[in-house]
Amino acid sequence: STSTSTSDYSAADRAELAALSKVLAQNAEAFGAEALARMFTVYAATKSYFKDYKDFTAAAPSIKAHGAKVVTALAKACDHLDDLKTHLHKLATFHGSELKVDPANFQYLSYCLEVALAVHLTEFSPETHCALDKFLTNVCHELSSRYR
């Protein structure tokens, strides 16, 4: 698909994502730091984009700060399901043109965020997982769009 359309999200997906976005916003630092720390452990090559970082654990101030930034951006993107392309354009350009991040890394971080949420949320139903996976797939697609 070339962009996210309204039809990509059912009413149930939208309800799941609206609830999840609140949880993400309230716990951005904790979930973000854990997701990044998991990514740096499981996909060690991703560390190459963070040359100034010495500590890649979830307790590191730099990991907490970047994790909070990422998860806050994802929570805000949940409010723009019908126009992710426009909403994420600046971030896509920054990551694609300036940072030149390998687009595969967006998917790696998505996997790690899903694991972190599944571990910590008591209400992480298959329906929540499905809606989140659909959303993160669309976010990854849009963030990768400035490479082409």
Swiss-Prot record:
Quaternary context: Heterotetramer of two alpha chains and two beta chains.
Residue(s) carrying N-acetylserine: 1
Question: One GO MF term, please?
Answer: heme binding
| Name this protein carries in UniProt | Hemoglobin subunit alpha
Q: Where is the Globin domain positioned along the sequence?
A: 8-148
- Any one cellular-component term (Gene Ontology): blood microparticle
UniProt record similarity statement: Belongs to the globin family.
Source species, domain of life? Eukaryota
**Which GO annotations describe the biological process of this protein?**
hydrogen peroxide catabolic process
Protein role: Involved in oxygen transport from the lung to the various peripheral tissues.
Could you tell me which CDD domains the record lists for this protein?
Hb-alpha-like
What Pfam families would the database entry show?
Globin
Q: In which tissues is it expressed?
A: Red blood cells.
SUPFAM superfamilies for the chain: Globin-like (SSF46458)
Q: Which organism is it from?
A: Heterodontus portusjacksoni (Port Jackson shark)
- Matching InterPro entries: Globin, Globin-like_sf, Globin/Proto, Hemoglobin_a-typ, Hemoglobin_oxygen_transport
Q: At which positions is O2 bound? A: 66
Ligand binding (heme b): 95
Enumerate the UniProt keywords alphabetically: Acetylation, Heme, Iron, Metal-binding, Oxygen transport, Transport
